[in-house]
Amino acid sequence: MSSGGLLLLLGFLTLWAELTPISGQNRPMFCHLPADSGRCKAHIPRFYYNPASNQCQGFTYGGCGGNANNFETRDQCRHTCGASGNVGPRPRIASN
């Protein structure tokens, strides 16, 4: 096979890996953690993966603490945790 053919194959496999959804078995464990606003009092919009609905949902992050199930964008959440494209409701997180 020529080097051009190998590069084309490599490009195709890379694209396929990026577009293939993550199965529940391959999902990082932190994707199963609950939304955690943390201990600080800022009001930063973030997203977390909700395994019950298989969706990335919005929550308000306090700015410190919390856990790894915390993403700046819905796309980051979907890419990392393999959520469906449906948009779920924005849950309310009680402030301390």
From Swiss-Prot:
Keywords, in A-Z order: Disulfide bond, Protease inhibitor, Pyrrolidone carboxylic acid, Secreted, Serine protease inhibitor, Signal
CDD domains: Kunitz_PPTI-like (cd22608)
UniProt xrefs under InterPro entries: Kunitz_BPTI (IPR002223), Kunitz_BPTI_sf (IPR036880), Prtase_inh_Kunz-CS (IPR020901), TFPI/VKTCI-like (IPR050098)
Domain BPTI/Kunitz inhibitor: 31-81
Disulfide bridges in this chain: C31-C81, C40-C64, C56-C77
GO MF, one annotated term: serine-type endopeptidase inhibitor activity
Signal peptide segment: 1-24
Keyword Ribosomal protein: no
Known tissue expression: Expressed by the venom gland.
Gene Ontology CC terms, in alphabetical order: extracellular space
Proregion positions: 85-96
Pfam families: Kunitz_BPTI
Matches recorded under SUPFAM superfamilies: BPTI-like
Residue numbers carrying Pyrrolidone carboxylic acid: Q25
Site keyed Reactive bond for trypsin: positions: K41, A42
Location of the protein in the cell: Secreted
Function of the protein: Serine protease inhibitor.
Family: Belongs to the venom Kunitz-type family.
Name used for this protein in its record: Kunitz-type serine protease inhibitor C6
